Amino acid sequence: MRSLGITGGAGLALGAMSSIGLAPAVASTPRRFQAPAAGDLIGKVKGNHSVVILGGGPSGLCSAYELQKAGYKVTVLEARNRPGGRVWSIRNGTEETDLNGETQTCTFSEGHFYNLGATRIPQNHNTIDYCRELGVELQMFGNQNANTFVNYSGNKPLANQSITYRAAKADTYGYMSELLQKATNQGALDQVLSKEDKEALSSFLTDFGDLSSDGRYVGSSRRGHSAEPGAGLNFGTEIEPFGMSDVIQGGIGRAFSFEFGYDQAMTMMTPVGGMDRIYYKFQDAIGTDNIEFGADVSGMKNVPEGVTVDYVVEGKAKSITADYAICTIPPHLIKRLNNNLPSDILLALDAAKPSSSGKLGIEYSRRWWETEDRIYGGASNTDRDISQIMFPYDHYNSDRGVVVAYYSSGKRQQAFESLTHRQRLAKAIAEGAEIHGDKYTRDISSSFSGSWRRTKYSESAWASWAGAGDSHGGMATPEYTKLLDPVDRIYFAGDHLSNAIAWQHGAFTSAQDVVTHLHQRVAQTA
């Protein structure tokens, strides 16, 4: 079972265990957020109770939205000229000057876009709840596609070959099933499985791996056809399988477990028209008179009257004092503010390490991925710097579309960070052509790229905690835990203070947690 988990991911191992009655039951007891209500404070607590919120991204706008429900006076200060923060949809007219000093203006055709930030929503995330509440229309997001490719470089067997996911899965699952079938038949599992267990496992493996009657994998229609079945006696031509040794050594199944992840398994969703639609809806609900865009925060201090925040708008220095503050500025940028935070808090903030990630979108005037490769959504994966090529999930069968030519993170993204956009584009096209061929280099109308480490006011795609075992969760490091509590009247919120780092869900749960504690604190003053 352990080898099944390593090769095919947890889903394959659990499937086999379930077949013989060994899979554990899963219990789920979600904790529901109780939003503050209008009657909570009226007639009970004196004062208007103002809250200034630093940052108009997911956690900031969510905090403002929920606090307004109970009658709090909220002011959101956002340095950019748009809502959403790192949730950023690139479309015609988008203009940005990065920290390299290069300015790009997007010229995509009307109605076409890509999400430079968050792009997908798991169905178990509370992001969907806010979409329902705010009236944001959702559509399916193709997180996986059997027709997209894997292509890995190097000198191992099957290297530098574009292999469809369906073929890679059929061969990998087929041979792994054959090997486990042989091990079972040869008595290797007699110490742990009864006769009935082995019969049940054999039945599962025969079906899962599409094995022959004698327990061998000899190919499968699941791989696809070089000539599709047609009418009459046209039975099509199945594609022959790769050899067992080549499949094992080539590691073509290395990306299979991605779609087994709790937060990556289908069905995935995304807003129609771009992920930023959520934040324009938040903006409408909160009211633009309660959000100040272009507000570059320079200072934040606890004072006897509450919290004073200094900021600059179009070169003019301004200041606001509120009863409380919720700071959603990225942790590694907070220490740049003029502040009176204790030294242990500054050290805790410094433990949140910025990460590299970025994307490049190419608008093609011809949807070759649909007409030639029959790809509708999903992504091709590689070990090259581009990491993956993501295909559009909208405008199917139209005349053009935007392909995300890379979505890379870590060291692979660092290979793009210092490059100009033209250099990024050239590198992306060259690596993409190694997967999808010469057609990848033609019919390009326009492009736009972004690197979050080189994006002003973010300078990171997400934060990871030094010493944590999981880059996408706080894992209760001392620094992480320290920032869960307020510093006098200053609260901290963001996905970095959740166990869903880099997800909008994480930002929302953090905001909900802060709103709950702040509201309880105010109510206790009654």
Regions found by a protein language model. Name each.
Residues P36-E178:
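N-terminal glycine-rich phosphate/pyrophosphate-binding loop and immediately adjacent elements
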Residues Q181-D296, P304-G306, T321, L337-N338, ...:
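Active-site/ligand-binding neighborhood in enzyme catalytic cores
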Residues F293-V404, I435:
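Mid-domain catalytic core of redox enzymes
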